[in-house]
Amino acid sequence: MHRALCALGEEKGYGHFADQVGNTYLYRQRYSMDEPYWLVGSHLDSVIEGGRYDGVAGIIAGLLVMGWAERDGVDLPIRVGAMRCEESSNFGRSTIGSGLITKEIYKHDVGEAVNKQGETLHEVFDRKGYSLTPDRIQGIREYLELHIEQGKVLEEYGDAVGIVSTIAGPRRFKVHVHGNAEHS
């Protein structure tokens, strides 16, 4: 999906690059890479049964804003970011792509996470040429992420839009229970 996003960006005349953990960014080429920018994006991976437009809606929203700015000549240094391993149903740990580049997650937190094929995240990153110790992302003025609702709160209240400033950080645990199932 990241390659397809890059190809779409090229069709539209946008530049693209991947950071040290494989997150993909599209940008308007008229702006210096050193100039502060707004980052709009989300992720392209999803959890099983996560919803058809789970993270993709945020990527499309960023592309629409960037296209509007380009078409109307609006002075808006914007990048669209597609983070990797945000849901990470493969490694049992979420927000890896964004966490590593913001220094909210460190190598020792995730490097030994194992996927369904028995590979550690460290091994996968080594094979792909990514780093578990990337530089901290720089230059972001603000970050905006459009996302699907993951519950029914808006629907129950009859609201079309909800705005949040933080989310609950998910934690997963593996638990082994020893004993007998003798009561429901």
Predicted regions and their residues:
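Short coil/turn connectors at secondary-structure junctions
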Residues: 12, 33-38, 72-78, 138-142, ...
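Alpha-helical metal-binding/catalytic segments enriched in His/Glu/Asp
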Residues: 40-43, 49-89, 173-177
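Midchain, well-structured core segments that form catalytic/ion-binding scaffolds
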Residues: 85-184
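Acidic/His- and Gly-rich active-site-bordering loop/insert found
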Residues: 1-51, 69
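Flexible, glycine/charged-enriched surface loops at secondary-structure junctions
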Residues: 19, 77, 132-136
